[in-house]
Amino acid sequence: MEITPEQFKRIEHCLPVQRGNVRLSNLQVVNAMLYVAEHGCKWRGLPNRFGNWHTIYTRMRRWTKAGVLDKMFEELQREQLVRVKIEVVSLDSTSIKVHPDGTGAPKKNGPQAIGKSRGGWNTEIHMVAADARTAVTFCLSPGQAHDAPEGRRLLQSLGPASRPIHLLMDRAYEGNETRQLALDLGFIPVVPPVRTRIEPWEYDRVMYKRRNEVERLFRRLKGYRRIFSRFEKLDAMYLGFLSFVLVADGLRGLC
C-alpha cells in the first residue's frame, strides 16, 4: 500500500522544500519508508523502483534528527483530535521485542530505551490514545521499567485538561500517586483497584470497556513489521518510524 498524491498533499508542507536537480521526490521517499515499515526489510532490500536505498535512508535519518516526522505527526494529530472530539482517553503500554540488529548502540549516543526482562531484550511503548486510530502522545522506556512512572510522565506532558475527560487505565496504574496526578490535571480516572486493596473503590465498568481502543491501536501499529520488532539501535529512529506509521495510518482514515 502506498500514500497517494492526494494524501501526500496533507503532509507535504511539513517536509523541507526540494531545490535543484533532485532525483527522488519526497513522495517517493515517503512511500519507500512506508514499504520498509510495512515489510520490515533492510534498507538495502528496498526494491529498485524506489531508487537508491542509501539516499532514502539518509533523508529519513535527516528528517528524524530535524524533528520533521514529529511535526508531521503533530499536524495530522490536530486534525484527528478535532474530528473525534475527545471525551475519553486511554493510557496503556505494549512490549516490543528488540531484534539483535537493534542492540549495541554506540555509547556516544547515550542510553537507549532497551532493557532486559524475562523475554529477552525489550522496549516498551507507552501511549495515550483518544480512540483506536488516534494517538495523543507516546514515549519509550526499557522493557524492565514499571508502567506507572512512565504513565505519569506522559500525563504530565499533556498538561491540565481543558475540561473533565475520562482517563481509562488498567491496574498497572491504580496506585495513589498516578490517580492523584490524574485528578490534579483535571482527568476523571477510571481504573479498577487491585484485589488486595483494603478499601477498594467503584469504577464505571461500562466506560472501562472502551480501554480496548488503545489495545486495538497497538494491534494496528504492530501490523507494521518495523514496529512489531525493533531493528533500530537508536530511540530517535524507532520513534521516527512510530510517528511516521501513525501519520500513514491516519492519512488512510482521513482521505
Listing of model-derived features with the role each one plays in the protein:
Residues 1-255:
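Short alpha-helical elements
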